């Protein structure tokens, strides 16, 4: 490439840090009539920049220099300030993600990708921490079952072995077991032969519980429900050891039951679009570790990923980002058109795929904040042209909140929620409700008129007005609304709404004390976009510190709540999450998820003793 950016921390102060940016012209031609465009996950103070002007939308920054010529083999330099308190720059991923130079005096405008060198950090480097040595386990089972009785000997599955069904609810689990035995071990059970694996009903077991017995023969998987058989199959798959043409399984008795009814994983597909097969791959892994819920984050400021047949603009416009698109580039892939969406037929495929593995799919449609993709796609319904309110969201947008005073907002909600409710069998529909910035709606004549009509005294009460409409709508469709922690701030929603609490476990318990049912999702332990170490090359964010494998494993939910405290009944379960601002490919996804996912799986299934 002919251009390169060097980016460095010049000075660190308690609130703001000063940065230097150098754009090198490495070509043999002068660079004229240029502008620089790049992404960074921090907000640049617009009045702090030298020798240029800057405009920022989300993570996408456009820099216009005072002198728009860089001679061949010369450079441009500027400085600017970023608020870094309380989160200083620790990682290379804190720096500039991607960049391009645009030539503005020709049509069509020409764009050149720019090499971005790793940020020169001012803070002392931390060496990558070593994972503590551990003793090898005699049995590799994750999560650890409640009861294990190891017996002498092993059972051999041979070329003549087959799977026998003695339960009407075991068929789909048996199909999955066959598929995974073939995929993982290249072993194909026969339709005719010895019934060496038997799945049979045990009505004494609760939903999700199972009994697995291996002695002389046959291998017995017992459960009272489809998901119980899936869990039993997942355990059997971990016990198997290849031995030539056979598979050996240790003689053992395992009794297991989930600790929480809800054991979930959230995947953000809005910040970066993840292809269907990547989504299904994750769901299959969740089944192996006995999760039973896949929370699908389908909409956000950066993209709308679900087909709504009555509103095709949402995916025609809102599913795509790029320099020549309505939505600007964000995070990565700046000079490419990035995005995509899932058709309703593809979503049905995912729902069926997950159901075969005992997993319920919960969709999330994030409102009233995080709605920029929808607003840009449907401005005739969702844009309030008279609103002069000044605000900036936590991701640096000033136009990402739905207006509770526009009739189009309610038409939009009706269309979307009706199609979503018809598409997803899940009783829960996630409505977001998080991170509505201060300052919204205060200078909108329409919103002020609505406040006067309803007797509201604070503009934030309008969020409750909108959420209660969504809650009532979902209830009429036979669904229960769930939302992030902010949904319960103030008198916004009824106690029928389930709260996903992400700030801390103590915050979750406070929600439960108010009478809400709660899903535990403390970011300090369960957010998989959190970096795993303070080494600068480690990808991730650190607003909640770092979460190495050991910390994820040692997380013990509700350890300070007495066993018989009725508050425990309000805790429906636990969930981990992967936000994907920094995740745009399979390798990065795997790195962020594993092995911490396997450690957190135990928090939903077994009771660990904290160190």
UniProtKB/Swiss-Prot annotation:
An example Gene Ontology biological process: polysaccharide catabolic process
UniProt protein name: Beta-hexosaminidase
Protein induction: By (GlcNAc)2.
Reaction it catalyzes: Hydrolysis of terminal non-reducing N-acetyl-D-hexosamine residues in N-acetyl-beta-D-hexosaminides
Known partners and oligomeric status: Homodimer.
Keywords, sorted A to Z: Carbohydrate metabolism, Chitin degradation, Glycosidase, Hydrolase, Periplasm, Polysaccharide degradation
UniProt KW Hydrolase keyword: yes
């Amino acid at each position: 490439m002919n251009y390169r950016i060097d980016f460095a921390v010049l000075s660190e102060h308690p609130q703001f840090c000063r940065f230097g940016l150098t754009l090198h012209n490495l070509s043999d031609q002068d660079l004229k009539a240029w502008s620089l465009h790049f992404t960074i996950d921090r907000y640049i103070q617009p009045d702090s920049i030298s020798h240029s002007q800057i405009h920022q939308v989300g993570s996408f920054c456009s820099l216009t220099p005072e002198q728009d010529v860089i001679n061949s083999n010369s450079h441009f330099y500027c400085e600017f300030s970023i608020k870094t308190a309380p989160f200083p720059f620790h990682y290379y991923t804190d720096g500039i993600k991607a960049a391009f130079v645009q030539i503005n005096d020709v049509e069509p405008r020409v764009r050149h990708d720019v090499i971005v060198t790793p940020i020169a950090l001012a803070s002392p480097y931390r060496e990558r921490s070593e994972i503590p040595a551990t003793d090898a386990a005699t049995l590799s089972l994750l999560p650890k079952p409640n009861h294990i009785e190891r017996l002498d000997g092993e059972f051999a599955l041979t070329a003549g072995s087959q799977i026998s069904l003695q339960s009407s609810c075991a068929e789909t689990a048996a199909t999955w077991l066959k598929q995974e035995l073939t995929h993982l071990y290249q072993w194909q059970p026969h339709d005719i032969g010895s019934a060496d694996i038997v799945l049979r009903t045990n009505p004494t077991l609760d939903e999700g519980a199972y009994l697995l017995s291996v002695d002389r023969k046959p291998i017995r998987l017992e459960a009272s429900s489809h998901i119980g058989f899936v869990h039993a199959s997942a355990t059997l798959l971990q016990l198997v050891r290849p031995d030539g043409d056979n598979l050996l399984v240790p003689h053992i008795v395992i009794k297991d039951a989930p600790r929480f009814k809800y054991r979930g994983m959230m995947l953000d597909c809005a910040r970066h679009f993840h292809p269907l097969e990547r989504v299904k791959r994750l769901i299959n892994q969740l089944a192996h570790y006995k999760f039973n819920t896949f929370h699908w984050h389908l909409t956000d400021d950066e993209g709308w990923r679900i087909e709504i047949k009555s509103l095709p603009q949402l995916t025609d416009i809102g599913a795509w980002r790029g320099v020549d698109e309505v939505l600007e580039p964000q995070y990565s892939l700046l000079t490419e058109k990035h995005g995509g969406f899932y058709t309703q037929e593809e979503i049905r495929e995912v729902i069926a795929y997950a159901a075969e593995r005992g997993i319920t799919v919960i969709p999330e449609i994030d409102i009233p904040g995080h709605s920029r993709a929808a607003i840009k796609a449907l401005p005739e319904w969702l844009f309030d042209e008279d609103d002069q309110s000044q605000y900036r969201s936590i991701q640096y947008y000033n136009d990402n909140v739905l207006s509770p005073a526009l009739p189009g907002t309610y038409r939009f909600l009706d269309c979307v929620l009706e199609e979503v409710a018809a598409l997803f069998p899940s009783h829960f529909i996630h409505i977001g409700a998080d991170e509505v910035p201060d300052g919204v709606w205060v200078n909108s004549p329409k919103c002020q008129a609505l406040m006067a009509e309803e007797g509201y005294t604070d503009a934030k009460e309008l969020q409750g007005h909108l959420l209660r409409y969504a809650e009532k709508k979902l209830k009429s469709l036979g669904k229960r609304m769930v939302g992030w922690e902010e949904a319960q701030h103030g008198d916004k929603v009824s106690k029928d709404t389930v709260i996903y609490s992400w700030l801390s476990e103590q915050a979750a318990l406070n929600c439960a004390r108010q009478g809400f049912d709660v899903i535990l999702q403390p970011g300090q332990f369960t957010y998989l976009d959190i970096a795993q170490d303070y080494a600068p090359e480690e990808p991730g964010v650190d607003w909640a510190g770092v979460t190495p494998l050991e910390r994820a494993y040692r997380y013990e939910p509700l350890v300070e709540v007495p066993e018989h405290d009725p508050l425990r009944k309000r805790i429906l379960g636990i969930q981990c999450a992967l936000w994907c601002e920094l995740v745009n490919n399979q390798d990065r996804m795997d790195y962020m998820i594993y092995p911490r996912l396997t450690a957190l799986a135990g928090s939903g299934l077994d009771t660990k003793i904290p160190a």
